[in-house]
């Protein structure tokens, strides 16, 4: 079976499932957005996204159309990651700890396209998807928002 075709099909299924059928409470959240004790360092730190407990190799679809701003390993603890800018909403999404990245900087990505695979790269305790949602704050600066609002 063609791996890319399977990945695109699986990712589109996950995207439809996520946005239309799954409630935030049903997502496999292994670490919530907000303040927490970091599982490796033991420090009290702000967690800028949510960790979703998907198996290594699970396809990751882009949640919205967007432009790839970062793609690869930036040695910032996220391991392999993709940062997408979504001009229609003036927001960003980051997908981190990926085992494989399928997109390149400046590439335009359509909603549902597989951008990579869930992995365990960077500063992690195991395979998962770290998902961030970055929006304009009240003062015009970009701020982290709880990604689970996308499912409410």
Report each predicted region and the residues it spans:
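Surface-exposed, glycine-biased beta-strand/turn segments
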Residues: 14, 18-80, 89, 111, ...
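Short histidine-centered loop motifs in beta-beta connectors
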Residues: 55, 61-62, 71, 88-114, ...
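Histidine-centered divalent metal-coordination motifs
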Residues: 47, 97, 128-134
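Short peripheral tails and domain-boundary helices/loops at the edges of structured domains
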Residues: 134-152
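Sec-dependent N-terminal signal peptides
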Residues: 6-15
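Positively charged n-region of N-terminal signal peptides that target proteins for export
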Residues: 1-5
């Amino acid at each position: 079976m063609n791996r890319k075709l399977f990945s695109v099909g699986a990712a589109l299924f996950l995207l439809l499932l996520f946005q239309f059928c799954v409630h935030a409470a049903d997502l496999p959240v292994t670490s919530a957005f907000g303040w927490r004790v970091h599982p490796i360092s033991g420090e009290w730190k702000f967690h800028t996204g949510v960790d979703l407990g998907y198996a290594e190799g699970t396809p990751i679809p882009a949640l919205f159309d967007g432009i790839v701003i970062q793609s690869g390993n930036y040695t910032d603890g996220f391991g392999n990651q993709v940062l997408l800018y979504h001009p229609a909403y003036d927001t960003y999404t980051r997908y981190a700890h990926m085992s494989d990245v399928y997109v390149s900087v400046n590439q335009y990505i359509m909603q549902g396209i597989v951008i990579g695979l869930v992995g365990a790269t960077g500063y992690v305790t195991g395979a998962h998807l770290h998902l961030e949602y970055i929006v304009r704050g009240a003062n015009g600066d970009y701020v982290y928002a709880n990604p689970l609002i996308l499912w409410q």
